[in-house]
Amino acid sequence: MNTGTDSRSRRYKDAELQRASHRNWILFVLALIAGSVYISWLVVNIDWSHPWIGSLFLGAELICAVSVFLWGTMLATKRLHPEEGFPWEGDPPLVDVFLAVCREPVQVVRPTLQALSEIDYPHYRVTILDDGRAPEVEAMAREFGFAYSARERRHFAKSGNLNHGLAITSAPFVLTLDADQVPHPEIISRLIGFFQVPTIGLVSSRQVFDLPEGDPWGNADSVFYDAMQPGKNDANAAISCGSGVMYRRQALESVGGFPTWSLVEDLYVSLLMEQRGWRGVYYAFELTKGTAPTD
């Protein structure tokens, strides 16, 4: 198995990505030269008779320049992994699947439960974490043979709900899903093999949404899924996108579970894992399909 720790020549789509990388680096260097010329010109030509205004303007331009530099270094080189993932060598491990629910309509939740019952993997168990305490959701969970748990008090919103799930389960790997995210039957089998590399703490998959034709409002979030995540993946620093993400329980426990102070617990838990030496992997193919605003 090669998840990026072996030589670059063996990477998935290596030749294609290398050509794109060379082109991107040329464009980045040209942009860097142009930016340096502009900043140099700006320092000389700012009206320094108003030093506070001039300093604020120069500072704002420098912040923009640094942002462009960081974006350029991140986007210049990308890494992808094969669509089929990597097979688990030996007996496949148990995976806990958390479906976080909070007052979503039944017609939204049911297709997700149906898809969860059709996952093609021998050892997984589903727990419905219902912060809405809806009797109809509990009935559906029983109908499909899934575990159901509803907290007495909804402390810390989704983060608290996921941490509650961690407290009542024990599998070494955890897959998190939102209520509207209908999973692919092979979602577990395509992601689990990455964890044979012991330093990998999470694997984040691409989310796809049921969008109007042409995606007029840009809800596909192509910048994130087609540019940012593949670029961060090259540095082993891909981040969790919250749903359709598999975590190593040990990695979650090493950072105290999902952070409860932030509304973007997926991003922050990724940063905490990076600080502890865990790596994030991005799987660039569709494994879930959710809903998005239509107007």
What are these regions (language model features)?
Residues 93-96, 125, 268:
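Cell-envelope/extracellular polymer assembly enzymes that use nucleotide-activated donors
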Residues 1-91, 141:
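N-terminal membrane-anchoring/stem segments of glycan-assembly enzymes
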Residues 150, 154-173, 184-263, 274-275, ...:
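Long helical/loop segments within the catalytic core of UDP-sugar-dependent glycosyltransferases
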Residues 263-269:
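Acidic donor-binding loop at a coil-to-helix junction in glycosyltransferase catalytic cores
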Residues 122, 130-137, 153-154:
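A conserved acidic beta->alpha catalytic loop
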